[in-house]
C-alpha cells in the first residue's frame, strides 16, 4: 500500500487539450536578419488556422528640416488632444509624397511653349467643357449614332413647306430659264430638299413613337417598359442618361408596334404620376 501511496497519479502527467485555447505565438530569428512569426487563430467557420509571416525590418534614415522635426514633436490639441504622435488613420489621410524636380532650363521651355502654343491652348480651354449633343434627341452622343435618327426629325428643324419659295419662278439652270449657262442638278433650286423616302423597317415606328418628358433621374428602362406595355407591344425603349453619373436626363422615347396602342398610351399616361413627378407624353416629331 505504501508503494501505491507514493506513486504519483497518472492524471497529473496527462495534459488535457482545450479546444478553445490557441497555442502561443512563436517568433524565430533567421540568419538573413528576417523574423518568422507563427500564430494561430480561428476562421469564420470556427476552425483553427495557422498563420506564418516573414518580416524584414528596414531602417530608413531621413534628413528633414529642423523646424519640421520640431513641429512633429508638438503636443496635439483639439479633438486630437492626448493622442499619440504621428497621423491617426481615422482622422488623417496620408497621400503619396511627390517630389518636384524642375529641369535646368525649365523657364526657357515654359516661355517657348507659351509663345508657340498660346492660341492652341486657348482653343483647348474653350472646348474642354463642351459636350457632344445629338441634334435629334438632345442626348450625349453623336447624331449619326442616335437610335431614333430614322424615326424623328432633328429638334427645331424647319419643315420642308416653310422653306418653299416662289413656286412660279423657274428653277435656275432649267430649260427655258432665260440663261444659257448650265447649272448642275444638285445646285438647282429645290435640290437641297430631301427626296422621296421609301417605306423601310422604321416607317411604322415613325408613326408610333412617344416622347416622354419630366422623367425622374432614378427611372429605369425596365420600369418604363412595364408602364407602357399595358397598352400594347413596345418595340423599343430609349432612356437618355448622363454620361458621367449614368442617371436619367429627364426624357425618354417609347416606340409601339401599333399606332392605336401608342395613341391610347399617350392619352392615359399624359399627366401620370411616376416617382413623385408628372409625366408629359406626346407623339415624337416625324422625320421629314
UniProtKB/Swiss-Prot annotation:
Domain RRM residue range list: 208-286
Cysteines engaged in disulfide bonds, as pairs: none
CDD domains reported for this sequence: eIF3G, RRM_eIF3G_like
Subcellular location: Cytoplasm
Entry keywords, A to Z: Cytoplasm, Initiation factor, Protein biosynthesis, RNA-binding
Database matches in SUPFAM superfamilies: RNA-binding domain, RBD (SSF54928)
Pfam families named among the record's database cross-references: eIF3g, RRM_1
Region Disordered, residue ranges: 1-33, 156-197
One Gene Ontology term of the molecular function aspect: translation initiation factor activity
GO cellular component: eukaryotic 43S preinitiation complex; eukaryotic 48S preinitiation complex; eukaryotic translation initiation factor 3 complex, eIF3e; eukaryotic translation initiation factor 3 complex, eIF3m; multi-eIF complex
Main localization category: cytoplasm
UniProt keyword Cytoplasm present: yes
GO biological process: formation of cytoplasmic translation initiation complex; translation reinitiation; translational termination
Keyword ATP-binding (UniProt): no
Signal peptide extent: none
Role according to the record: RNA-binding component of the eukaryotic translation initiation factor 3 (eIF-3) complex, which is involved in protein synthesis of a specialized repertoire of mRNAs and, together with other initiation factors, stimulates binding of mRNA and methionyl-tRNAi to the 40S ribosome. The eIF-3 complex specifically targets and initiates translation of a subset of mRNAs involved in cell proliferation. This subunit can bind 18S rRNA.
PANTHER family tied to this protein: EUKARYOTIC TRANSLATION INITIATION FACTOR 3 SUBUNIT G
Complexes and interactors: Component of the eukaryotic translation initiation factor 3 (eIF-3) complex.
Family: Belongs to the eIF-3 subunit G family.
Name the UniProt record assigns to this protein: Eukaryotic translation initiation factor 3 subunit G
Species annotation: Aspergillus niger (strain ATCC MYA-4892 / CBS 513.88 / FGSC A1513)
Gene: tif35
Amino acid at each position: 500500500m505504501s508503494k501505491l501511496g507514493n506513486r504519483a497519479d497518472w492524471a497529473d502527467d496527462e495534459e488535457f487539450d482545450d479546444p478553445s485555447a490557441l497555442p502561443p505565438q512563436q517568433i524565430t530569428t533567421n540568419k538573413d536578419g528576417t523574423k518568422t512569426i507563427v500564430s494561430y487563430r480561428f476562421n469564420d467557420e470556427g476552425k483553427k488556422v495557422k498563420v506564418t509571416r516573414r518580416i524584414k525590418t528596414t531602417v530608413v534614415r531621413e534628413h528633414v528640416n529642423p523646424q519640421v522635426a520640431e513641429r512633429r514633436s508638438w503636443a496635439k490639441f483639439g479633438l486630437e488632444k492626448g493622442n499619440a504622435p504621428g497621423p491617426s488613420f481615422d482622422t488623417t489621410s496620408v497621400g503619396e509624397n511627390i517630389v518636384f524636380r524642375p529641369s535646368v532650363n525649365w523657364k526657357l521651355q515654359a516661355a517657348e511653349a507659351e509663345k508657340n502654343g498660346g492660341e492652341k491652348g486657348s482653343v483647348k480651354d474653350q472646348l474642354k467643357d463642351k459636350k457632344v449633343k445629338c441634334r435629334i434627341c438632345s442626348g450625349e452622343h453623336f447624331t449619326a449614332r442616335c437610335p431614333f435618327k430614322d424615326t424623328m426629325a432633328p429638334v427645331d428643324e424647319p419643315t420642308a413647306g416653310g422653306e418653299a419659295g416662289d413656286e412660279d419662278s423657274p428653277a435656275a439652270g432649267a430649260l427655258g430659264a432665260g440663261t444659257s449657262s448650265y447649272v448642275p442638278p444638285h445646285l438647282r433650286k429645290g435640290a437641297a430638299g430631301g427626296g422621296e423616302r421609301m417605306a423601310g423597317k422604321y416607317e411604322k415606328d415613325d408613326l408610333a413613337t412617344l416622347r416622354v418628358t419630366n422623367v425622374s433621374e432614378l427611372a429605369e428602362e425596365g420600369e418604363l417598359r412595364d408602364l407602357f406595355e399595358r397598352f400594347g407591344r413596345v418595340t423599343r425603349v430609349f432612356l437618355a442618361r448622363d454620361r458621367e453619373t449614368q442617371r436619367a436626363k429627364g426624357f425618354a422615347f417609347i416606340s409601339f408596334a401599333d399606332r392605336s396602342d401608342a395613341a391610347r398610351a399617350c392619352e392615359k399616361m399624359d399627366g401620370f404620376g411616376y416617382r413623385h413627378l408628372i409625366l408629359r407624353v406626346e407623339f415624337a416629331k416625324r422625320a421629314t
